[in-house]
Amino acid sequence: MRIVFAGTPEFAAEHLKALLDSPYEIVAVYTQPDRPAGRGQKLMPSAVKALAVAHDIPVFQPPTLRNEDAQAELAALKPDLMVVVAYGLILPQVVLDIPRLGCINSHASLLPRWRGAAPIQRAVEAGDAESGVTVMRMEAGLDTGPMLLKVVTPISADDTGGSLHDRLAAMGPAAVVQAIAGLADGSLQGEVQDDALATYAHKLNKDEARIDWSRPAVELERLIRAFNPWPVCHSTLDGESVKVLAAKLSTGEGAPGEILSASKDGLVVACGDQALSLTRLQLPGGKALAFTDLFNSRREKFATGKVLGQ
């Protein structure tokens, strides 16, 4: 079977690795154009491109698949199937129709819940009990196609966006390989999604990461976990930015953002309902530290009565 793979970040690269170890022929890889990255803003290849180059697989990086030249280039590859994982470009219907068996997608949620750009973080933020990977046939709509296969994992009370991402990135590749086998032998037909159950995982916005201390502590604790490692929740103290990488629910009352206590166990801050104990912070110019270490060296900065977010 001739497969074209389309993907961009590390999550997609894990899927490409599994396909390279499978009996299927990867005839080409599509990925987004190189982007500036790092302090020097040098053009850097995507994780998928780096892996493809290392395996001598032809790489295509069109800025769009909406023009006829890009579509003709894909058609010339004569693919049987296109596997799309976190590619980042919209595939018009003419592209979806090029492969003999169509296009399939590995999506990091239990569809139809959390269609869209940020399903992993939104699942943690919402307090979902479980997440997973859905392999589906692609349609012109956003993550609306018939579902071929699902794998499920519970979301634990200490899962972050990063830890759930890594777990799903490890689960998804085997599901894709299994789905391809099912398509090849005709055993997988696909289950139509119930649009009435659909929710949308909107793209992450850095402004969302600014902590609003008037919100309930339970919501903020989930948000802090969901946005770790990016975009990372933050607030201000004494006019300086403070990144909050970990917190746990606590008790106490005060004005939203008010420091209620500080000890080696954490910095307890009042919220709109209950309080949070901040256990891992990062100050400007420093690295992320357990609050125990900050408390020992910067005790005066975290005096009771000070207010975060002002």
Swiss-Prot record:
EC number in record: 2.1.2.9
Annotated residues for binding of (6S)-5,6,7,8-tetrahydrofolate: S109, L110, L111, P112
Catalytic activity: L-methionyl-tRNA(fMet) + (6R)-10-formyltetrahydrofolate = N-formyl-L-methionyl-tRNA(fMet) + (6S)-5,6,7,8-tetrahydrofolate + H(+)
Record-level Gene Ontology MF annotations: methionyl-tRNA formyltransferase activity
An example Gene Ontology CC term for this record: cytosol
Keywords: Protein biosynthesis, Transferase
InterPro entries (alphabetical): Fmt (IPR005794), Formyl_trans_C (IPR005793), Formyl_trans_C_sf (IPR037022), Formyl_transf_N (IPR002376), Formyl_transf_N_sf (IPR036477), Formyl_transferase-like_C_sf (IPR011034), GART_AS (IPR001555), Met-tRNA-FMT_C (IPR044135)
Pfam family of the protein (one): Formyl_trans_C
Major enzyme class: transferase
Cited Gene3D superfamilies: Formyl transferase, C-terminal domain, Formyl transferase, N-terminal domain
Function: Attaches a formyl group to the free amino group of methionyl-tRNA(fMet). The formyl group appears to play a dual role in the initiator identity of N-formylmethionyl-tRNA by promoting its recognition by IF2 and preventing the misappropriation of this tRNA by the elongation apparatus.
Family to which the UniProt record says this protein belongs: Belongs to the Fmt family.
Stated name of the protein: Methionyl-tRNA formyltransferase
Native source species: Pseudomonas putida (strain W619)
